[in-house]
């Protein structure tokens, strides 16, 4: 037990590397840690209480809100507001950004964007789900309510990002721009403990993750990349293995550990893609680049995109560097056919 480093201890250690740090970001991360524990407890008991299934309402994207979506959203909002380090949040479950109105919150330096429960439709069948978060330093004046500009910042302005995966074990993975570290929740002591230090994704992988049920609607470049993945070329390590869970956090986490690529391209029904730039793609892009991988919309680096609206969608290709480069090649060569 003496060799364990908890998330709290790790954050304090890293803060010591920056003598002029105020500790606000450390406190903010502690709020996320607390909310993750509460949500984890509820997910673990989801089959025993009236917490699964749909609420009967839709979010701004037109998706059915699950009971756990609403629960997780409320818990993360409450935890972030209570610590006074956050002036406002944007969430998949909220039509507009939420400003915290207490004076202490308006004096806060940070805004948080989040998907409180990614993959929540999988809860009823006991498949891994997750929370995704992204932290920015506000651009509006301290002491005033947050503005839309605080949230519509490109991904390269992020100061921290991460996710929590609620699976066979619960893990919190995050970066502040100095590498990626993972912490596994130990329920016996109620703490996240460092289990995966300085996580790096292999430059090549053997896994591709995409919903092939939409194959007929994919751009030609993506169709040809899938065929490339399936070709029998043993000297090149192909065919690759197809693995798709349907939960971004779960698919991303596996590929981060093992090497691979996650693809959610544009389709005929979703020409702008389906994943949200601000609270799904940007945080995952920050993590993957810190781990040695790449994230792209098929043409541009994800973190260079300038957001124009809160719930903006983009095509998303993320994972091992060489695999993302390869799918970009296929998209470029076949763009005129689409």
Curated annotation (Swiss-Prot):
InterPro entries: FBPase_C_dom, FBPase_class-1, FBPase_N, FBPtase, Fructose_bisphosphatase_AS
Domain of life per record: Bacteria
Keyword Magnesium: yes
Cofactor (UniProt): Mg(2+)
Disulfide bonds: none
UniProt GO molecular function: fructose 1,6-bisphosphate 1-phosphatase activity; magnesium ion binding
A GO-annotated cellular component: cytosol
Subcellular location as annotated: Cytoplasm
UniProt-annotated binding residues for Mg(2+) 2: 115, 118, 280
Catalytic activity: beta-D-fructose 1,6-bisphosphate + H2O = beta-D-fructose 6-phosphate + phosphate
Binding site for substrate: 118-121, 211, 244, 262-264, 274
UniProt xrefs under PANTHER family: FRUCTOSE-1,6-BISPHOSPHATASE-RELATED (PTHR11556), SEDOHEPTULOSE-1,7-BISPHOSPHATASE, CHLOROPLASTIC (PTHR11556:SF35)
HAMAP family recorded: FBPase_class1
Family statement drawn from the similarity comment of this UniProt entry: Belongs to the FBPase class 1 family.
Protein's UniProt name: Fructose-1,6-bisphosphatase class 1
Organismal lineage: Bacteria, Pseudomonadati, Pseudomonadota, Gammaproteobacteria, Vibrionales
